């Protein structure tokens, strides 16, 4: 009753009329109150039957998810906007390799700019989708397109670094024309895969949380199964193989070079064969490898849960996919858009230098290093080197 629910210090002035009424907890929902009952009538037609009988989520979850999307979206849009502003203002940073970084920033920026406002709007207004079935299809299409482009670009960045660090001068250099070709291919690839559900192979659907839309990963017909399997192989498994292979050979090449130098130094009875310039070169190589591996590892953390839930829902036990379980991989996948600009800001000394010039109030402190003419090939081709001057366009 209300009397039992009331704290003791207010019972004395709670009117007796209210004592026997049943207490109402606005945060509690009866077990019979399902997602289908909670969904507005205009979205019930495209809410997958798998979700109909699940109990409606606690309202606090919607506010929590809305807050998460607000934080991630704001960080992603602001961070990638700064990256693009830096590249546009300082022409010296626009190397062929950095064009790939720019493409990654464009993809991440557009993804969050297009998706996070409606997610925040839905969740803070109670959860259910408020933009109709067509809006749901567009939302899912944009998420898939920009996500595929991000994956393709990260794969090409890893191959470019493999080509420079492992092959060196024997490798094919990345020219501006090649970089533009790769970027064009990445968008064609992304558009091709993201259009498939719109033309009948696979499908887009509203997620169980009802505030976002993505792939239909709970239908187990052969059309949907074949699409999910093909998309997972082409845009998750294949990139993993390429990326892991590239970084394996990068690390192997660095350690092999170190071993050869130690062996030669031992024969000559000297402590080290390295000059200061060589030491800086190897430090750059190791730093690039570490940062790249960290970037890919975080990308795997973001996209692996989504890949797993898609395979589980279409090929496994779909009953294990609850509305909350379906919400976690979707929001994790979007976190990569927020931390990509942070990783690149940390990994590139010259980016930080230009960032400091553009925003002096950020108090960015750089360690001063000796600059020599004998710069490493890796530094010249894969990072913003000490020779790049931050001169505004």
Model-identified regions with their sequence ranges:
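Intrinsically disordered regulatory tails of 7TM GPCRs
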Residues: 1-56, 256-289, 294, 349-393
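Loop architecture of class A 7-transmembrane GPCRs
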Residues: 18-21, 25, 44-54, 123-140, ...
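Extracellular TM2-ECL1-early TM3 structural module of rhodopsin-like
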Residues: 58-70, 96-157, 163-172
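First transmembrane helix
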Residues: 61-90
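Helix-to-loop junction signature of class
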Residues: 66-72, 110-126, 140, 147-154, ...
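Cytoplasm-facing ends of alpha-helical transmembrane segments in multi-pass membrane proteins
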Residues: 77-88, 109-117, 145-168, 182-184, ...
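Class A (rhodopsin-like) GPCR signature focused on the TM5-ICL3 interface and adjacent 7TM helical core
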Residues: 153-165, 197-208, 230-269, 291-313, ...
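Seventh transmembrane helix
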Residues: 242-243, 301, 307-311, 327-373
